[in-house]
Amino acid sequence: MKSFAAAFAAAVLWSTPALAADPVADRYAAAMKAARWTGPLLASNAETLPKGHVYTEPYFFDGISGSDHHPGTSGFYQYGLRDNWTVGVQPFFSLGTQRHNREMAVGDFKLLSQVRVSHFTPDHRAPSVAIVTNLVLPTGKDDHLAALKQGHGSGSFAPEVGINVQQYFLLGNGRLLRARVNVLRQFPLRHDVTGRSVYGTGPDFRGHARPASKTTLIAGAEYSLTREWVLAFDVEADAWGRTKVVGRDGDGPRIRSTSPRSWNVGFAPAVEYNWSDRAGAIFGVWIVPEGHNTAASVTPAIAIQRFW
């Protein structure tokens, strides 16, 4: 009996390290429970929604470039198709501010799809990683424009692929720093163009255009100041290839134009307030200095998020 008890005690002693809780995991779990997030202004989540749940986050903004204002609304409306697969739509609407153009216009919508391949937990502290496959729809008007009217679309279907990464870092004060990285590449397809268009063609033009490809790199960070308040900061770099337009203006000679490449780098400080685990708001400003063949702009924005 004594030998059995000794053997049992030895087994317990040997197994205790394997069964004992990971103190770092415990600290991560406590910190994650004490933090609420909206997400930064620009960088997207690498997580997916639980199956059957819905996420809504409408954005309201005013893009300011020089003396021109371009107010509008966009956002994310997503559904958990599977626990590791989220789909959704990103609409875009803008409001004309010119005296002859004060109506609401529809821009290009984007269909969203994201498959998560890795999931951060307090016990498994590898980054969350998701593969992104989106599709831009040519819902905005790009040609057949009346005189003095602006276009709000590209006219092109544009597949987009990328990767989203998200990681948590536990700081010495017990609060969390959450970091995100997004890498995206967009490939617009060739499409027909008729008349006045966003590509600068005249009223009698007939031809086609291939919009520039676009590469986007976003790095974002959020610091959980308190349970409700979060400080956020994003840096986004965008690079565009060459847009090509080919056709004829009426009976004139064949036209072939190619735009130069362009790029810019902007940043977006923001403040989040989350009044519950399911709802919050963010206010920030996206500031883009003048880049290579791009104008400077300042875009204040506010968004309200809700998990259903």
Residue ranges of predicted features:
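Outer-membrane beta-barrel biogenesis signature
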Residues: 19-57, 63-64, 121-126
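Hydrophobic, lipid-facing positions within transmembrane beta-strands of outer-membrane proteins
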Residues: 39-41, 52-54, 71-75, 107-113, ...
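Short loop/turn motifs that connect adjacent beta-strands in outer-membrane beta-barrel proteins
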Residues: 44-52, 84, 118-129, 170-177, ...
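Residues on the lipid-exposed face of transmembrane beta-strands in outer-membrane beta-barrel proteins
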Residues: 56, 75-79, 111-117, 133, ...
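Transmembrane beta-barrel strands of outer-membrane/channel proteins
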Residues: 58-62, 89-93, 131-137, 179-187, ...
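Solvent-exposed loop/turn segments connecting transmembrane beta-strands
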Residues: 64-70, 95-104, 173, 261-262, ...
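Outer-membrane pore/translocation modules
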Residues: 95-211, 252-261
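Outer membrane beta-barrel transmembrane domains
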Residues: 204-308
